């Protein structure tokens, strides 16, 4: 699992940690306001830069998840509902899984509707949401412990590779990663500013429509935060009302979980919102032969190693070469942070009322998340090497970051030089990330983005506009949960289809098929497939074009 370069980073981080613990005293000095602002401003600028620069070209091509967001966003804008009879729904049913929440498509719809469907309009909303999560991370750190924690929390949110890479993925479930710190920041500040409770509870409820793991996390988190706000807040009625609003918004998600866990029939709520019965809903009381302790350990290990192996690093998908090393310094920081928080909890000192409330809210949400993952997480969550159940595990990333923040604050309090050394290590990590992200490694390794398919699909649409011939699209693009559905979404995205006519044209103007070696093409139709799929075909009478492993054949003119 560990490479030599990753072990070098781990060793440096551990050495800094031990030096800070054994030598201490000067960290009690506070940083000047000017320096603090300069560091925070630089972190935000760097974070925004790597999220937004070359957004339309890196990664090249399109993925099934990105296509799903773009196509359904355009469908929502043009028709008022999602494609293929889904209407307004709580879970897009193109394929089952954590990546098909409708929220990101809803956020993307105005961009696509007003400015047209392009990579910029489809990718920009999630990137902007991730930018908004950076000041929210600062606010959450400030609510938890003060300015020092706010600064470190901001640095992690802005520069940590996980937060950067997910901001560029345009996957529906990634929205939850950025909604959660925004929600907790608002709710934590709502203890002293009750008006902030309302948007905070609303955002927390919306996580259930980003990633289906929050079907189970969101209601308990809303209830816990509302109770804590009732106990610590100044105007208790605001806590009760805002909590009720959050739970009300959550009702459609609750019904979706009920339908799919009990086997009940799908329904339409108030004649408006479709509550779907999904064929492969993955959340179950799974691995029943495991003890609760074994499940908890598996979830914890998976959550920690998310920081190391997120984005399928082991399979070299999505992620630049050598990225494992960029995560390694997090391990000792999380360990030190956990010990520091435990020591503070047992020393008997009382925190200020506002900070005590914020800490209780984060702790309660973390506990709810762990419990939900143990009870309902995907089967992959129980794979202890942390390489599967990725999007389920992403629910824990915020709490990994909180532990890292606590560790960094401890180092700064102990020794300023060691804190500076850790900043330097983080800077090296981030510089390496930026070099690989924009220098070509990310481009070469993002092998679930298919630029060749995109180019050939657009070319097929040009030919069809001239001839009216039917386009047959291969469903064998990559091993997706539902390969043909993924291919269909990618084709509709690449051709910028009119969503008002797509359902009527399905099977007539275009069709997704499974290609075989012995298949012979119809003389009056267009075929888009992998080049190796049609190597044995008789192509007499057809013109042939190819791009990056994808072939287009069409009747010769």
PLM feature segments, named:
Residues 1-272, 298-411:
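Membrane-integral, polyisoprenol-dependent glycosyltransferases
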Residues 1-8, 251-254, 276-281, 288, ...:
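Transmembrane helical bundles and short interhelical boundary loops of multi-pass, membrane-embedded
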Residues 143-144, 351, 457-458, 511-517:
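A generic local structural motif
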Residues 240-244, 359, 399, 417-423, ...:
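Ser/Thr- (and often Asn-) enriched beta-sheet segments in non-cytosolic proteins
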Residues 58, 92, 383-387, 418-464, ...:
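Membrane-proximal, lumen/periplasm-facing interface regions of secretory-pathway glyco-
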Residues 5-9, 461, 465-557:
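Luminal/periplasmic acceptor-recognition loop/helix of membrane-associated glycosyltransferases
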Residues 82, 165, 294, 480, ...:
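Flexible, glycine-rich phosphate/dinucleotide-binding loops
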């Amino acid at each position: 699992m560990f490479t030599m370069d990753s072990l070098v980073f781990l060793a440096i981080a551990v050495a800094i940690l031990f030096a800070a613990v054994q030598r201490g005293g000067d960290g009690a000095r506070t940083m000047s306001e000017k320096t603090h602002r300069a560091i925070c401003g630089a972190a935000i600028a760097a974070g925004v830069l790597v999220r937004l620069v070359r957004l339309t070209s890196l990664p090249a091509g399109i993925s099934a998840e990105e296509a799903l967001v773009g196509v359904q966003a355009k469908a929502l804008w043009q028709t008022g509902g999602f494609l293929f009879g889904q209407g307004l729904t709580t879970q897009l049913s193109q394929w089952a899984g954590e990546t098909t929440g409708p929220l990101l498509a809803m956020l993307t719809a105005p961009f696509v509707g007003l400015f047209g469907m392009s990579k910029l309009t489809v990718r920009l909303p999630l990137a902007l949401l991730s930018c908004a999560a950076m000041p929210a991370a600062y606010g959450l750190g400030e609510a938890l412990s003060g300015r020092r924690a706010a600064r470190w929390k901001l640095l992690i949110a802005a520069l940590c590779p996980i937060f950067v890479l997910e901001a560029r993925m345009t996957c529906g479930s990634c929205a939850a990663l950025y909604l959660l710190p925004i929600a907790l920041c608002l709710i934590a500040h709502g203890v002293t500013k009750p008006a902030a409770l309302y948007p905070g509870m609303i955002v927390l409820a919306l996580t259930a429509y980003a990633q289906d793991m929050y079907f189970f996390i969101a209601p308990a988190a809303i209830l816990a935060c509302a109770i804590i706000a009732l106990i610590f807040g100044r105007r208790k009625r605001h806590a009760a009302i805002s909590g009720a609003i959050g739970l009300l918004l959550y009702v459609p998600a609750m019904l979706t979980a009920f339908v799919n866990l009990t086997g009940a029939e799908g329904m339409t709520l108030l004649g408006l919102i479709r509550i779907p019965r999904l064929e492969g809903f993955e959340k179950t009381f799974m691995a029943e032969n495991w003890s609760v302790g074994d499940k908890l350990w598996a979830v914890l290990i998976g959550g920690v190693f998310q920081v190391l192996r997120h984005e399928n690093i082991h399979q070299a998908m999505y992620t630049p070469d050598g990225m494992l090393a960029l995560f390694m310094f997090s391990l000792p920081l999380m360990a030190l942070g956990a010990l520091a928080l435990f020591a503070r909890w047992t020393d008997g000192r009382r925190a200020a009322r506002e900070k005590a409330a914020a800490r209780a809210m984060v702790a309660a949400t973390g506990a709810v998340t762990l419990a939900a993952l143990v009870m309902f997480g995907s089967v992959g969550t129980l794979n202890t090497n942390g390489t599967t159940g990725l999007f389920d595990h992403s629910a824990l990333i915020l709490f990994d970051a909180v532990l890292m923040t606590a560790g960094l604050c401890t180092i700064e309090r102990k020794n300023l030089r060691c804190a500076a050394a850790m900043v330097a290590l983080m800077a090296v990590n981030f510089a390496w990330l930026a070099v690989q992200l924009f220098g070509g490694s990310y481009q070469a390794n993002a092998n679930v983005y298919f630029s060749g398919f995109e180019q050939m699909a657009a070319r097929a649409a040009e030919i069809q506009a001239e001839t009216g011939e039917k386009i047959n699209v291969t469903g064998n693009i990559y091993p997706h949960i539902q390969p043909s559905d993924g291919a269909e979404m990618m084709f509709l995205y690449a051709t910028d289809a009119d969503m008002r006519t797509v359902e009527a044209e399905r099977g007539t103007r275009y069709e997704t098929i499974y290609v075989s070696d012995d298949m012979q093409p119809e003389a009056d139709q267009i075929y888009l497939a992998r080049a190796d799929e049609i190597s044995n075909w008789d192509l007499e009478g057809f013109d042939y074009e190819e791009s990056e492993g994808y072939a287009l054949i069409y009747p010769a003119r």
